[in-house]
């Protein structure tokens, strides 16, 4: 019964959500696009000619926005464990980023030290228990960070979803040791009750 009430409440919030309505009106696949757009408007992360990887891409809001900003030049690779409808000038990998063969498929597409920007909106399936969800989420951040350290070119940038909890401070410290600028962003489109924030790391140092 509680789950039914919770589901109804979530659906009501979803359909009343200004960002959901905005995404529908502007032809975007998800409200999440406005999280990336707000940060990109301030930081100018995405430009034509770049090589960009988008992890946790489905249904494709971030990828769609990046594709528009890149204007058909450069290379944009999206990856997700869930299917995603095709987008112009986007290469899509269907698979679990945690699996070695999927990671290798991605590495094969992007020559080492040529990546300009890593985007990651990856999140685990949430159980509702912070003791379970936060470590799972942090593991995904760690995997994304490891990939960035192997693939980013000098001066490259990274934007990853990160949840407040155990391991948060350590990951921020690690990022500050490898990048010139590290900040935490909470975009307006992130729901206030959510523990999600975004770690922006700019200027990768080899």
Swiss-Prot record:
Keywords noted in UniProt: Cytoplasm, Methyltransferase, rRNA processing, S-adenosyl-L-methionine, Transferase
Keyword Thylakoid among UniProt keywords: no
Gene Ontology terms, MF aspect: rRNA (uridine-2'-O-)-methyltransferase activity
Record's function text: Specifically methylates the uridine in position 2552 of 23S rRNA at the 2'-O position of the ribose in the fully assembled 50S ribosomal subunit.
Enzyme class at the top of the EC tree: transferase
Coiled coil: none
Residue positions binding S-adenosyl-L-methionine: 60, 62, 80, 96, 121
Major location category of this protein: cytoplasm
Reaction catalysed by this enzyme: uridine(2552) in 23S rRNA + S-adenosyl-L-methionine = 2'-O-methyluridine(2552) in 23S rRNA + S-adenosyl-L-homocysteine + H(+)
Active site: 161
Gene3D superfamilies: Vaccinia Virus protein VP39 (3.40.50.150)
UniProt entry tagged with the keyword Transferase: yes
Name this polypeptide is given: Ribosomal RNA large subunit methyltransferase E
Gene, per the UniProt record: rlmE
SUPFAM superfamilies: S-adenosyl-L-methionine-dependent methyltransferases
Compartments where found: Cytoplasm
